[in-house]
């Protein structure tokens, strides 16, 4: 991976065990004002769990499978503003749907972003058409590309609910970033009712850029794993990164980090102004006898986040199992 300006001056402000009761990675954690949410893949279904901080996060409230499924690391609150009919938006969340086998990827990625309303859409769903949704994510922004080359697709919302990020990866290499006004996105979805899609190619955006060396295993790539995206109120973009540990009788733990793309340095030519939080050298997330896998990032403010981390260890049969999912509140400078 490419060397960036690094910091290890990290502070753990709080932490807690999600205690989901199920041995699987929490791919996305979200700490809300009332509840804590977790996204796990359970028997092929994207499952959203909910609970209170300090207790078990183990109540399944949403299960997406079939055409409503697909690998996703997106679970983002849609904001606190009223909809186009003057109704409260509380209860609406963004999540990835519609599985798609992509050339060059072993993962069945979600290719659309749906908006789910927990007030009336909890429980199991089998079709992406159960929800209003954003489609043609590969056509977002100023640099569209072929849909069969889209190997990641995620969404994020800024803490003040003004900015909406679509982040995709083309051909397991090129990172595409498009920032929208969140009100614009929500209003377009409101206009579509309960089950139609919005073609992102037709939606006005605020900024769009690509990083052609974002992802890969070579020394010129920024990250070798993308576990989560988020952005702060100023438009700084953050990426959490760590591959799952290799397991072949022994473990090999991969480098863990958070990469920050400043709002004033959104180009490959400005990568010398990017920052990396070196969590491996920091060491504060390491637990004896367990091997970490950094998962999602939830930005609270600039250089301040909740970070979800899964931990793996061997059981008595020598099998690799996920044995713990922690959420850490971190800050750094």
UniProtKB/Swiss-Prot annotation:
Coiled coil: none annotated. GO terms for biological process: defense response to bacterium; killing of cells of another organism. It holds the Pfam family Helveticin_J. This is Bacteriocin helveticin-J. Keywords: Antibiotic, Antimicrobial, Bacteriocin. This heat-sensitive bacteriocin inhibits the growth of closely related Lactobacillus species. It comes from the Bacteria. InterPro entries: Helveticin_J (IPR035280).
